């Protein structure tokens, strides 16, 4: 519940900020371009990228329970400031605070999962899928709620969101205990220094996972904010032939996002329950193929203004199916990262903090590339850039699969029959 409410607030702020920036000139601020949206989104993930290893190490030293409570405090401060200003520099600073919110909480939660699922790959698959599901459900619900709340409350909705952050803090404070005592404890007073952190990373296999995970997150990052901005801004005469750039209302965008989030959520649950029967890399490969099918169908829809309605409905089938399959790549990659933390029981928080690092790098690349692509070619640019990122993600899978065989021998004996 803590992850759900925290991510709800994160998604709500992110989407409402897009609506706010799209009409910032009406509130006395400047006009905002696609590039500005990209920079703001990148700032959020840059903060998460830079601060996650630090907070992961602090969680290993001081306890997961204590450190995760900083997240909602940073988030509440950010949304209050967002509702009070139209200054782009201050709004950019609030994106850093929001990123710090995620950086403080996520490594602590993932360290908890890594300890709680020791020696049980079935439980680990379900746990990481549920973490991703809670993350997606929270972000999705926040993004979907942003349209109605912005329509009803406008800037006052940011202050309401601060209350939700307060609820998240209360859940972490009173509803979560540090798991290390229940598992024999790895409590230690040794500081996880930068040198120690680099030593851990040099001995782990995480760098083989990094290219695929970064590219997948870049593909997702292309759409996290740019798509909303492209959908809701007024029609651009340069892209009059693109059906998806007709200037939709926030309520319509929220409805479409709700359907997409439900499909993605269902995919997370389905593929997370396949860890015992299928290799992580196999699930990731299927996900990348599903993403490519989604892009191809979306291109046809975007240029299908003259197509009969029945043909458009048929094209929605590979969009929905591709999204469902693509969803499996996220818990599979997270499961691999948890497997790689097994040899480092005292440093799980630091290693699992790489989840946010890789996510942050991918989202920064995706956000900036998406801003440039959308500014140049609209939705077509986003779709082409997505296909490029998916192609990059599939390239390292062969080497990653070899590492997975080694992990099977080390921590999952008897798993060699997996497909």
Question: Where are the language model's segments positioned?
Answer:
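Hydrophobic core of transmembrane alpha-helices in multi-pass small-molecule transporters
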Residues: 4, 89-104, 309-328
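Structural signature of the two symmetry-related core transmembrane helices
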Residues: 66-81, 282-298
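Residue-level signature of mid-helix packing/kink "hotspots" within the transmembrane helices
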Residues: 44-53, 139-140, 261-269, 363-364
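Helix-to-loop junctions at the C-terminal end of transmembrane segments
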Residues: 50-63, 266-280, 374
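Loop-to-transmembrane helix entry
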Residues: 28-43, 126, 130, 237-261, ...
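Juxtamembrane intracellular "pre-TM" segments in multi-pass secondary transporters
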Residues: 177-211, 414-419
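Conserved MFS/SLC helix-loop-helix module at the cytosolic interface between two early adjacent transmembrane helices
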Residues: 49-86
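Cytoplasmic helix-loop-helix junction between adjacent transmembrane helices
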Residues: 94-135
């Amino acid at each position: 519940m803590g992850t759900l409410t925290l991510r709800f607030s994160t998604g709500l702020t992110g989407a409402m900020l897009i609506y706010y920036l799209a009409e910032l000139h009406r509130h006395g601020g400047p006009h905002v371009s696609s590039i500005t949206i990209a920079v703001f989104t990148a700032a959020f993930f840059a903060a998460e990228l830079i601060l996650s290893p630090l907070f992961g190490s602090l969680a290993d030293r001081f306890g997961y329970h204590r450190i995760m409570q900083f997240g909602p405090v940073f988030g509440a401060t950010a949304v209050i400031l967002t509702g009070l200003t139209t200054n782009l520099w201050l709004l950019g600073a609030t994106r850093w605070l929001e990123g710090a919110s995620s950086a403080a909480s996520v490594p602590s939660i993932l360290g908890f999962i890594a300890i709680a699922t020791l020696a049980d790959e079935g439980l680990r698959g379900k746990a990481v899928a549920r973490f991703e599901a809670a993350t997606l459900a929270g972000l999705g619900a926040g993004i979907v709620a942003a349209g109605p709340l912005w329509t009803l409350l406008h800037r006052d909705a940011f202050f309401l969101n601060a209350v939700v952050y307060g609820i998240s803090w209360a859940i972490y404070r009173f509803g979560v205990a540090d798991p290390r005592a229940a598992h024999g404890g790895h409590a230690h007073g040794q500081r996880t220094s930068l040198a120690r952190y680099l030593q851990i990373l040099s001995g782990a296999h995480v760098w083989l996972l990094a290219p695929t995970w970064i590219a997948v997150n870049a593909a997702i990052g292309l759409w996290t904010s740019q798509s909303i901005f492209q959908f809701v801004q007024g029609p651009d005469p340069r892209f009059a032939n693109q059906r998806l750039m007709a200037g939709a209302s926030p309520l319509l965008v929220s409805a479409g996002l709700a359907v997409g989030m439900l499909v993605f959520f269902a995919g997370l649950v389905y593929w997370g329950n396949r860890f015992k029967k299928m290799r992580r890399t196999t699930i990731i490969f299927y996900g990348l193929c599903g993403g490519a099918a989604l892009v191809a169908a979306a291109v046809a829809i975007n240029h299908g203004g003259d197509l009969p309605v029945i043909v458009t409905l048929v094209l929605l089938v590979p969009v929905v199916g591709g999204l469902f399959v693509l969803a499996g790549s996220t818990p599979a990659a997270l499961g691999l990262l948890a497997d790689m933390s097994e040899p480092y029981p005292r440093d799980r928080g630091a290693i699992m903090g790489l989840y946010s690092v890789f996510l942050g790098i991918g989202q920064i690349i995706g956000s900036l590339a998406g801003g440039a692509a959308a500014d140049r070619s609209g939705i077509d640019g986003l779709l082409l850039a997505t296909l490029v990122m998916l192609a990059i993600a599939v390239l390292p899978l062969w080497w990653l699969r070899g590492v997975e065989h080694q992990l099977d021998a080390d921590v999952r004996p008897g798993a060699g029959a997996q497909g």
